[in-house]
């Protein structure tokens, strides 16, 4: 519990600090998140999730996964949430 409280306190402190004071930390967080998002393992996970969603939609509408991949995004999401 103390670690969570300390973490929240630090985050709130960083939010209320002037950008010049907290800029380096936020820049580091932003650059690290960007590097992680563009890393190979994350790309593989995103592709796996996309393929699983395509297969699920294809199964629901009775089409092939490639046909499900060609659907407009709105229709695709509507089918996922039905």
Curated annotation (Swiss-Prot):
Question: Where does this chain mainly localize?
Answer: secreted
A Pfam family of this chain: Antimicrobial_7
Q: Which protein is depicted?
A: Opistoporin-1
InterPro entries assigned to the protein according to its UniProt record, in alphabetical order: Antimicrobial_7
Tissue expression, as annotated, is: Expressed by the venom gland.
Disulfide cross-links: none
Q: Where in the cell is it found?
A: Secreted; Target cell membrane
Renumbered to this chain, the signal peptide range is 1-22
Q: Pro-segment residues?
A: 67-82
